[in-house]
Amino acid sequence: MPKSDIHPTWYPEAKVICNGEVVMTTGATQPEIQVDVWSGNHPFFTGTQKILDTEGRVDRFMRKYGMASSDSSEQKDKSSEEKKES
């Protein structure tokens, strides 16, 4: 039997709120939970995910592991020819 007066109040119908709109209900120790992102507006789950290429890291990865597009492979060939001529 649990001890009395030591457990938090349980709210079985706690509201999850995102941007002022109730998006779901769940059980929690707070009556309302404020969130910025949830599965309904997260880019991964909505299919609108974009890759942010910071400082060309994606291109660098693609070149390193041989997954580069034909445009970047042509540039690589030109740069290697220039190095050989020098």
Swiss-Prot record:
PANTHER family: 50S RIBOSOMAL PROTEIN L31, CHLOROPLASTIC (PTHR33280), LARGE RIBOSOMAL SUBUNIT PROTEIN BL31C (PTHR33280:SF1). Residues 65-86 are annotated as: Disordered. HAMAP family: Ribosomal_bL31_1 (MF_00501). This is Large ribosomal subunit protein bL31. It comes from Prochlorococcus marinus (strain NATL2A). GO terms for biological process: translation. Keywords: Ribonucleoprotein, Ribosomal protein, RNA-binding, rRNA-binding. It comes from the Bacteria. NCBIfam families: L31 (TIGR00105), PRK00528.1 (NF001809). The gene is rpmE. GO terms for cellular component: ribonucleoprotein complex; ribosome.
